[in-house]
Amino acid sequence: MRTAWLGLLLVTGAYASVARLGAQGRAPDGEYLVFVASEGNDRIALIRFGPAGAKVERDHRMGINPTELLGPHGIAVSPDGKYYYVTTAHGTPNGALWKFTTARDSLVGRVDLGAFPATLQVSPDGAYVYVVNFNLYGDPVTSSVSVVYADQMVEVTRIPTCVMPHGSRLNALGTKHYSVCMMNDALVEIDTRQFGVSRHFLLTKGKEHGMSGPPTVAARAGHDMAAMSHGSEPPKPGDLTCSPTWAQPSADGAKVFVACNKSNDIVEIDVGSWTMTRRIPTGDGVYNLGATRDGRLLVGTNKRGQSVSVIDIASGKELARISTTRKVASGVAISPDDRYAFVSVEGVGSQPGTVDIIDLVGLQKVASVDVGQQAGGIDFWKIVPAP
């Protein structure tokens, strides 16, 4: 039965072409393994990047019905590296969370969640998976964050948060969970010890402030859900909304960085005082964020700008803006050694998706490899010695 669920397993042995390394660049010392989900054709790929370049190590198609598109949106690897979890956005009426082994892509379990499950993260102890129910196509009503007990794949609670929640990130201790509300123009903080919303923060320019509890439906920022394009819609003249798409805690948990997709900047919030400390300019349509573990760099994908911004956190200065291979930059995963950023790029039309690999020392793209259409969710697995 598990084999039927997995679909076809494909193995690709050829390495993709590698960009020439500049004077500051050097070949990787080990081999880096990354999982990426392609929403356009239901494929999950394992990317291997090493001294010889980047390649698709293996890939498989999710589901049992080749005519039914499940739409894998988010992907997250467990802290012990034994499993990865995938959200599928499509369903009748709701989507689901799937659990696979990293070693062989074997299906371990599946659980139905809310409408359009999207971004997810596994808690640092591996016990729970936090999934936002994005509800992209539904009515403008309060949606939720699902909390799934990972061992048995059981949804233990569904926490009401806001309208169109997106992004799902925990601080390093796992005590606070952060997501954003595209329709409420807000950041939401969940106390994971209580499984409830503790605070929210309004992100609209000129109106920034924090409050206790969740945002209300009445606090919507005036977006039209029917017109939302998941981060691809530019702001209209005079529009001061943030339209947040991601929240990224700093390495020490003292700050939270929020990607404002419409205002093209990143809001930095001090967690202790729950106040805004600055707005950091980025490229056009900043979408997803990743932070290095040493607390030095912030990496943002620019969905409309076909680029990636690398920002020095201390100064707020954009150190580099690096073009992506194709349009619609999406997800980003940073290697545990802070050496590389792996960026998923959706592409447009019949184009394949792409994973671009950026050297965070040389600040340049050093490799690219094609994957399935609409590559989005991406997460790091492990580093292994080069042969």
Spans of features found by a protein language model:
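Predominantly soluble domains enriched in secretory-pathway, periplasmic, or organellar proteins
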Residues: 13, 20-387
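Bacterial N-terminal signal peptides
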Residues: 5-16
